[in-house]
Structure formats: structure tokens, C-alpha cells
């Protein structure tokens, strides 16, 4: 087994097309895990092993790959850059100890890289920065370094400087050693020479080296004092300081190169070893109680502790069902019986594997720090804790965003229904941001997801991976309803039909809740007019009605119910009577509280060439967008806007037409906002028409 200090659990994340997957391929080639390089544009890369990934040239799922460099074991996760798949990035960050943030040398800090950077900050994942594609037209390393400061509020620590740029890019100067690494044009990563710094770069190298040392010695008071007195620190001391500053995110060591041309990658791998933390150098994962509150205990990273592991991904591939697991504490051996604390059920561990993209090596045991795959686990879902039967515990749960878009699907023939149900069951286990419901009125299967591409891929998987021929409906927006006015009201439920009857009277206030508060219930009943044992029934009755509003039947958001008084009967009152009273009270009062339709607003980030920015802004305005910011860069303009989701369908096609294929955009859910009356009327009419059409079937 590799000792814990030599583990590096790292993720590679960035914007679409910044070169994440190619960077991963080069890491695997250099570490000896693959022999023929696969290119993303050929649809051959090792970590993009779904058909849909290979065809579209994007990474959709996070593939976990193990490899070795200088006696250190890397568990590498290649994450998607497309915003519809940020749940994969979030899920990966949960189990990583460090990361490589890849930026394009010409495109710089692009929309999705900003989102992923924010997620990594929230997860407190230490990172190094790799500015890729320096061989591209318009590449500028120092401009991208400045962008990371200005756009991401990051503190990049420049570790290398490029030798040449664009077609003339030959290699890099390592500022610590003052050595130049120069590659030939063969594309073979080992074909480089170590030379002296080019004469025309000496002054620039000394300038940046001094800045590097000044930042590094801030991590050690004694070294800083010695440096101020004219004593230069040793390279070992500087590396120790850089490692400390990287772990605390005081700065981010920044490198550059060209993954595609195999230039500069070895220094990035050395940096992973030298600067990114081992599993026992990051804050331990907190343990929680059943409600999700922290208990004050932690999963201490040690093989000698009791088992604490997190299932962070479920995948069904050609080998069978795989559960990807990060072991935080303890050991896991083939044949062990472990407890799933989420279900309370035990499972026996069959086969365990180290993953190499879509290949695997079976192993007999694993321990704290490992990321492995277990074959054939039952009843395990993403976010479940796997632990020692004698020492049950729960790790901090994963929280996934609510879907904002849905489509109706149906099999083309009756025989496809069962096949579709089995396939969808597997897909839900694999992707927690993918939800499926059955429409009660029409009986249709409704797929819900994070965006158009997300659902496109799901439909594609159903058709090609599982062979289900589908009829696919138009995308539908996840509208919501709320109220705008307080109502004080009462309701009595009374039913007498021989013997004991039903009786429950409630007096209550319904008022608009705080934004994002969802459903809030409280009671201010004084005395015993409504006994305490019936309060949960009243709450349950109100809560059960939040799924269907009165305007168009959409779920209701941000409403507060306060039970103020009421009455009960010693014989006829029961929990069910008060629950029925609350349900009827909801229907009675919600219509009086001036209900309002809400629509999802998306945070849209568009990159446009300068020549087309007027057209782009005009188009966003026509889509009812509110422009929030405009930032001019060297290669174009970033436009940030809040736009209703209903106006964004098919936007990528329009943007490509307006910008001759050069525009890019990312989009993520921001908040719900009141619909204009004209839009609300149209939505209500569409719902009525849909229901009428379903009634005729």
C-alpha cells in the first residue's frame, strides 16, 4: 500500500474546451497508464468513455483514474466543464483534496471556469493553476494571470514563465531553479532539454522570481526576517513555504504549457507532488446526526480508525453496477460486511477495483485516502455513508440543486415501457440532479434536469445505451407559485355519519414567507383549544398542499402558516380530522392571498467578439434579460445578465449565428421572480390546453 503522505486525490476542472480532458490524457501518458494518446477531437480520450462524451467532445461524468508519479499515487478525476453538469463538479469536489484549474491561454477566465472556481472555494479545495494552449493564436500567459486576479479575486503565484508564444512556444523557465525546459516539436513529452535562461528573459525571470520569493516567505516569519536581511532561502525552504500557502489557499501556484503539444506537463505533475495536500493534511470530514446537524465528531483520516466512507457516484457500465467510494477512515477488505447508515441495511463487499477510466484492476483491500469502485452494491445512492457495523455514523450529506427544466417522454411501443422504467431507475441512481415523475393526469413520464443539454444527453442514453425508442415532448419550464398578501382565516371540518364523527376547527394566518424559505409552520395557540398532539397533523395538512398551487397547479414557494387558535371535540377530534381541516383551509385561503406565478431566472454569462456585442445585448434584452455587467477583454466582451429560463431555449444556436460560431455562454439557476401578467396568462392558457388535450386521449 502507498503511505498516506504520498496520496494525492485531485480533480481537473475548467471551462468547456480549456483542455481538461487532454490535460488528463497527458498526465496518464506521462505516468505510464496509457500507451497511445487519445485526442478529444478524435473522440478517443481515455476519461471521456461514454458514447455521448466522445461524440460531443465534452466530459459529462467524472471519470476516476489512478496513476503514479515519483512514488506518489494520484487519484485523478476529470470533471465536466459544461454548466448543465456542474453537479458532477460539485460531487467531485466533495471527495477531492486538491485540484488543477485549467484555463485557456487565449480565452482566459471563461464563464464556466468562474462557476467551478467558486464551487472549489466553497469546498475549500487547494489548487494549482495550469494555463493551457499557449501554442494557440492570441495566447498570453500574463494576461490570463491578471484575469485570475481581476475576475476570480484569486492570488496566483507565478512559478514559470513561457519561452516564446503561439507558434513559437518552446517551453518554460522554472523560476525556482532558474532553469529553462525546452521541448522539440515531436510532440513526445520526454523530448526536452534543460538549458540556461534565454538571455532576453533574464531580467523578467529575476523580477518574477523575486515576487515569488516574497510571497513564499510570508508563510514563515523566520525565513522572512532572514530574507529581509539579505539571505536568500534555499529551494527546499521555498517549496515548504509554497506548500503551506497552497494548502491554506493563500495563493495558487501557477504554471503554463500546451497539453496538446506535450510541453510543460512534467512541471505540473511535480507541483501536484510538491504543493497539493495529502488526505491527512486537509480538514477532516464532519459527522452529522440524522437531521444533518454536525455532532462535533470527525472522520479522522487514518487506517486505524473505524470505517467511514462516502459513496459519491453510482455508475452502470459494461462491467456492471459500480459504486465509487472515497474512504475517509479505516480499512475495507473484500468479503467485509459493512453498514449503509442511510438505509440501516448491511452489505457484503464483493469485488473492489482501482479504476483506470473504463478499465479496472481488482484489489483485495483499500484504506483511508483511497478512491475505489465497488462492484454490485445494492440499495446504495450518491451521498450514502458506508461504515463499520459496530460503529454506525453519518458523513455530511451532499445537497443537489432542484431541476429547472422538464420534458415528457413515452416509449414508441408498449413493450418499451418496462425497458424504459429499468433504464430510468439506473440513471436516477447515477445522477442525483436528474429526477423523474409521473404526471397524475396524463400518466406521462416527466424527465427533469438542469438544462437542455442535460436532458438531451439523458434522452440519448435512453435511446442508444438502453435501446428505448422514445416520443419526446417540448421542454417545459419549472414554474412556481407564491402568495403576495396576508390572510387571517378559519376553517371547521365536521362530519357526522353515525357513531363517532370527525371534528377539527382551526384559526390561522397565511402570510408570504422570506425568499427561499419554502414552507414554514408555527403555532401560537395558547391553552388547550387545539391540543399539541394535533399540531403536527395541521402542519402535515398544510405542507401536503404545497405541491399544487391554485393558479396553474405548480408547486407553491415561500409561504408561512401560523396556527393561532381553534377548537376540538373530546370524542370526534383526531389527527386525521385536523389534517383534513388544514388541507381544506389551504384551498380556501390561498386564493384570497393574491397568488402569483413565479418563473426561474438564470444567471447567464455570455462571451462575444467585440464586433457582435451590440447584437448579443439587443437579443438578451428581447429575451426579457436584465444586463448586470459588461467586461471588455482582449479577445472579446463578457456580458452578464439575468434572463428568464423560458426565453433561453435554443439560445446556443442564435448565439452561434450572431457571432459566426465564436460566441460562448454558460447559464445557471439564480432565483425565482414574479412573471409579468402577459407571460402568466400565456402559461395558464398553455396548462389548460394541455390538460384539455390529455382529457380527450
Swiss-Prot record:
Binding residues annotated for GTP, in chain numbering: 14-21, 78-82, 132-135
An example Gene Ontology molecular-function term: guanosine tetraphosphate binding
Protein name per the record: Elongation factor G 2
NCBIfam families: EF-G (TIGR00484), PRK12740.1-5 (NF009381), small_GTP (TIGR00231)
GO cellular component: cytoplasm
UniProt superkingdom: Bacteria
GO biological process, one term: ribosome disassembly
Domain tr-type G: 5-280
Subcellular location, record wording: Cytoplasm
Keyword Membrane in annotation: no
PROSITE patterns on file: G_TR_1 (PS00301), G_TR_2 (PS51722)
PANTHER family registered for this protein in UniProt: ELONGATION FACTOR G 1, TRANSLATION ELONGATION FACTOR G-RELATED
Principal subcellular localisation of the protein: cytoplasm
Family: Belongs to the TRAFAC class translation factor GTPase superfamily. Classic translation factor GTPase family. EF-G/EF-2 subfamily.
Gene for this chain: fusA2
Originating organism: Shewanella sp. (strain MR-7)
Function: Catalyzes the GTP-dependent ribosomal translocation step during translation elongation. During this step, the ribosome changes from the pre-translocational (PRE) to the post-translocational (POST) state as the newly formed A-site-bound peptidyl-tRNA and P-site-bound deacylated tRNA move to the P and E sites, respectively. Catalyzes the coordinated movement of the two tRNA molecules, the mRNA and conformational changes in the ribosome.
CDD domains noted in UniProt: EF-G, EFG_III, EFG_mtEFG1_IV, EFG_mtEFG_C, EFG_mtEFG_II
Keyword line: Cytoplasm, Elongation factor, GTP-binding, Nucleotide-binding, Protein biosynthesis
Amino acid at each position: 500500500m502507498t503511505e498516506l503522505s504520498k496520496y494525492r486525490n485531485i480533480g481537473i476542472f475548467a471551462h468547456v474546451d480549456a483542455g481538461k480532458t487532454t490535460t488528463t490524457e497527458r498526465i496518464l501518458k506521462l505516468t505510464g497508464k496509457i500507451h497511445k494518446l487519445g485526442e478529444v477531437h478524435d473522440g478517443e480520450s481515455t476519461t471521456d468513455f461514454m458514447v455521448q462524451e466522445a461524440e460531443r467532445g465534452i466530459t459529462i461524468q467524472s471519470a476516476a483514474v489512478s496513476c503514479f508519479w515519483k512514488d506518489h499515487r494520484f487519484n485523478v478525476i476529470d470533471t465536466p466543464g459544461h454548466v448543465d453538469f456542474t453537479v458532477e463538479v460539485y460531487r467531485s469536489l466533495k471527495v477531492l483534496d486538491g485540484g488543477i484549474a485549467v484555463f485557456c491561454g487565449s480565452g482566459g477566465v471563461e464563464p464556466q471556469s468562474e462557476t467551478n472556481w467558486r464551487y472549489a472555494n466553497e469546498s475549500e479545495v487547494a489548487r494549482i493553476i495550469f494555463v493551457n494552449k499557449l501554442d494557440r493564436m492570441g495566447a498570453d500567459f500574463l494576461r490570463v494571470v491578471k484575469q485570475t486576479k481581476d475576475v476570480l479575486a484569486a492570488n496566483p503565484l507565478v512559478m514559470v514563465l513561457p519561452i516564446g508564444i503561439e507558434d513559437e512556444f518552446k517551453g518554460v523557465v522554472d523560476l525556482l531553479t532558474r532553469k529553462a525546459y525546452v521541448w522539440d516539436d515531436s510532440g513526445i513529452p520526454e523530448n526536452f532539454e534543460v538549458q540556461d535562461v534565454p538571455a532576453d528573459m533574464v531580467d523578467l525571470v529575476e523580477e518574477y522570481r523575486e515576487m515569488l520569493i516574497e510571497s513564499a516567505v510570508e508563510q514563515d516569519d523566520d525565513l522572512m526576517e532572514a530574507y529581509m536581511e539579505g539571505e536568500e532561502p534555499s529551494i527546499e525552504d521555498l517549496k515548504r513555504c509554497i506548500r503551506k500557502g497552497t494548502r491554506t489557499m493563500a495563493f495558487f501556484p501557477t504554471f503554463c504549457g500546451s497539453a496538446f503539444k506535450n510541453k510543460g506537463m512534467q512541471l505540473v505533475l511535480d507541483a501536484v507532488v510538491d504543493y497539493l495536500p495529502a488526505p491527512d493534511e486537509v480538514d477532516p470530514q464532519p459527522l452529522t446526526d440524522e437531521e444533518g446537524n454536525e455532532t462535533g465528531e470527525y472522520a479522522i483520516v487514518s487506517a486505524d480508525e473505524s470505517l467511514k466512507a462516502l459513496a459519491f457516484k453510482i455508475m452502470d457500465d459494461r462491467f456492471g453496477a459500480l459504486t465509487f467510494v472515497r474512504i475517509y477512515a479505516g480499512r475495507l477488505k473484500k468479503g467485509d460486511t459493512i453498514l449503509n447508515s442511510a438505509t440501516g441495511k448491511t452489505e457484503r463487499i464483493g469485488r473492489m477495483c482501482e479504476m483506470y477510466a473504463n478499465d479496472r484492476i481488482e484489489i483485495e483491500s483499500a484504506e483511508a485516502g483511497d478512491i475505489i469502485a465497488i462492484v454490485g452494491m445494492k440499495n446504495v445512492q450518491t451521498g450514502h455513508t458506508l461504515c463499520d457495523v459496530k460503529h454506525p455514523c453519518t458523513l455530511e450529506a451532499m445537497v443537489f440543486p432542484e431541476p429547472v427544466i422538464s420534458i415528457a417522454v413515452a416509449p414508441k411501443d408498449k413493450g418499451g415501457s418496462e425497458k424504459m422504467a429499468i433504464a430510468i431507475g439506473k440513471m436516477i441512481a447515477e445522477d442525483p440532479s436528474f429526477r423523474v415523475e409521473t404526471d397524475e393526469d396524463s400518466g406521462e413520464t416527466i424527465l427533469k434536469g438542469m438544462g437542455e443539454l442535460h436532458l438531451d444527453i439523458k434522452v440519448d442514453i435512453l435511446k442508444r445505451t438502453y435501446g428505448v425508442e422514445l416520443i419526446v415532448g417540448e421542454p417545459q419550464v419549472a414554474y412556481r407559485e407564491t402568495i403576495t398578501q396576508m390572510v387571517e382565516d378559519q376553517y371547521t371540518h365536521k362530519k357526522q355519519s353515525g357513531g363517532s364523527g370527525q371534528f377539527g376547527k382551526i384559526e390561522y394566518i397565511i402570510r408570504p414567507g422570506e425568499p427561499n424559505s419554502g414552507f414554514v409552520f408555527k403555532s401560537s395557540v395558547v391553552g388547550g383549544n387545539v391540543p399539541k398532539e394535533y399540531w403536527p397533523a395541521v402542519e402535515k395538512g398544510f405542507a401536503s398542499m404545497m405541491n399544487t398551487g391554485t393558479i396553474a397547479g405548480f408547486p407553491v414557494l415561500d409561504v408561512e402558516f401560523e396556527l393561532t387558535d381553534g377548537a376540538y371535540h373530546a370524542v370526534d377530534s383526531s389527527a386525521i380530522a385536523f389534517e383534513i381541516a388544514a388541507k381544506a383551509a389551504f384551498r380556501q385561503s390561498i386564493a384570497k392571498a393574491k397568488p402569483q406565478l413565479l418563473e426561474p431566472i438564470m444567471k447567464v454569462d455570455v462571451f462575444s467578439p467585440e464586433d457582435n456585442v451590440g447584437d448579443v445585448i439587443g437579443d438578451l434584452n428581447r429575451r426579457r434579460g436584465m444586463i448586470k455587467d459588461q467586461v471588455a477583454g482582449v479577445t472579446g466582451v463578457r456580458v452578464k445578465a439575468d434572463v428568464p429560463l423560458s426565453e433561453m431555449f435554443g439560445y446556443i444556436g442564435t448565439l452561434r449565428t450572431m457571432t459566426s460560431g465564436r460566441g460562448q455562454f454558460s447559464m445557471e439557476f439564480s432565483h425565482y421572480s414574479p412573471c409579468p401578467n402577459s407571460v402568466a396568462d400565456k402559461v395558464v392558457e398553455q396548462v389548460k390546453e394541455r390538460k384539455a388535450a390529455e382529457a380527450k386521449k
